[in-house]
Amino acid sequence: MDVCGWKEMEVALVNFDNSDEIQEEPGYATDFDSTSPKGRPGGSSFSNGKILISESTNHETAFSKLPGDYADPPGPEPVVLNEGNQRVIINIAGLRFETQLRTLSQFPETLLGDREKRMQFFDSMRNEYFFDRNRPSFDGILYYYQSGGKIRRPANVPIDIFADEISFYELGSEAMDQFREDEGFIKDPETLLPTNDIHRQFWLLFEYPESSSAARAVAVVSVLVVVISITIFCLETLPEFREDRELKVVRDPNLNMSKTVLSQTMFTDPFFMVESTCIVWFTFELVLRFVVCPSKTDFFRNIMNIIDIISIIPYFATLITELVQETEPSAQQNMSLAILRIIRLVRVFRIFKLSRHSKGLQILGQTLKASMRELGLLIFFLFIGVILFSSAVYFAEVDEPESHFSSIPDGFWWAVVTMTTVGYGDMCPTTPGGKIVGTLCAIAGVLTIALPVPVIVSNFNYFYHRETENEEKQNIPGEIERILNSVGSRMGSTDSLNKTNGGCSTEKSRK
């Protein structure tokens, strides 16, 4: 039976009396106009259907069959996925990646693992997340989520670019440390600070010159004291100022005997007075740092603190020796003065105290520390070369009457200065065989020294650039904060996340 050009087919019984149960969909008329004539072609299809169904009690009405072209074929029931099994499409500058939501949710603190963070990049029209970032790098970023926290840099991605991607996707400090370790970078030492507020202030004051203006002032004073101490150490050796404290035999008329006395006492020496002033500052600085340090064990492991201790020991040793000499016989005073001169020589190590306030010396020390293996190989190669060539030159010159090489140990000095390309000329071979040995020794020395030098230079460049980057990073936060505050004050807007349809909206607060 045809009604209005429609064929009969079975449809489920629908209650059209309640029009609220019919959902609005684009392209379908849902406005039931009661004023429309019954069966009028211009009326709504649903209103006409309502009339036809109400007039017949049989379910197989004229409107109960529709053409097969307009009916969707029956299919399987839809499977409702839980949140963890949902697929997520990530578009990286046009290259689409697909993963599951539970894979990203393993790391909720990251950009992709945090829903609110990643929703800022959601494209509701395409139902995907779009990032205008480096495409090859995302292979390593996605592998981090899939592997449960293993970071691997793709071979075709530079180190600095991949490091920027790790920072952008907020993978965290552990991922960055793992990446730097895999790439062969040396891990930065952790900075320990005292828990006590007063101790922390004094520790920063004396240990970190860049922490405040007062710390920089203390650093300037320390440098001046070190310079004065080194200057005094050098000036007192001049002939017009030198005081060797030579012993003089003086006859005592009262006792009718002779005794040995010093030409000048140490306590009347102006250099000793200046030295005492410097030692007071060094001791005060060392004791204060030891009291407020966060770890007493680490304090004695620090090479700089050991240098500070060694630099003040000669003064107290000299003071004790001077006091003891007043009661010791003259025979032991000569030995005491010899020991005293050796102890005073240790004062030269005070020059290393400047490295505490010099970034260049610190970089040099870190380079030597990181290159200990290469330096050990260099010394080992030199040792082999010295033994080999000193033996060869001895046997080449053994029959020469005027030879400088009377034994193999005498040839050690010649081999060292030749392999290091110094060549003093105080010892030289005279026979043709000895000259051939000398030529081979010089060539071997050049090759031995040149091999580890590139590694040492590479370590120096690494520490130098790392220190430069750290200084730049210290200046960046303040500049960024200033720019953000300036922009925020001009725009007067704050960004808020609108979770409707996965979008992100901006609410502007106008004053």
Swiss-Prot record:
Mode of membrane association: Multi-pass membrane protein
Selectivity filter (motif): residue ranges: 421-426
Its main localization is: membrane
Region of interest: Disordered = 22-50, 489-511
**Residues with a covalently attached lipid (S-palmitoyl cysteine):** C293
Q: Where are the transmembrane segments?
A: 218-238, 271-292, 303-323, 339-358, 375-395, 436-456
Q: Does the keyword Glycoprotein apply?
A: yes
Q: Which GO terms describe its biological process?
A: action potential; potassium ion transmembrane transport; potassium ion transport; protein homooligomerization
One GO CC term, this protein: membrane
Q: Name one Pfam family in it.
A: Ion_trans
UniProt keyword annotation of Ion transport present: yes
Cited function? Voltage-gated potassium ion channel that mediates K(+) permeability of excitable membranes. When opened in response to the voltage difference across the membrane, KCNA10 channel selectively allows the flow of potassium ions across the membrane down their electrochemical gradient.
Tell me how this protein assembles.
Homotetramer. Interacts with KCN4B/POMP. Interaction with KCN4B/POMP is necessary for the modulation of channel activity by cAMP.
What does the entry's domain section say?
The N-terminus may be important in determining the rate of inactivation of the channel while the tail may play a role in modulation of channel activity and/or targeting of the channel to specific subcellular compartments.
Q: What family does the Swiss-Prot or TrEMBL record give for this protein?
A: Belongs to the potassium channel family. A (Shaker) (TC 1.A.1.2) subfamily. Kv1.8/KCNA10 sub-subfamily.
Which protein is depicted? Potassium voltage-gated channel subfamily A member 10
What organism is the protein native to? Homo sapiens
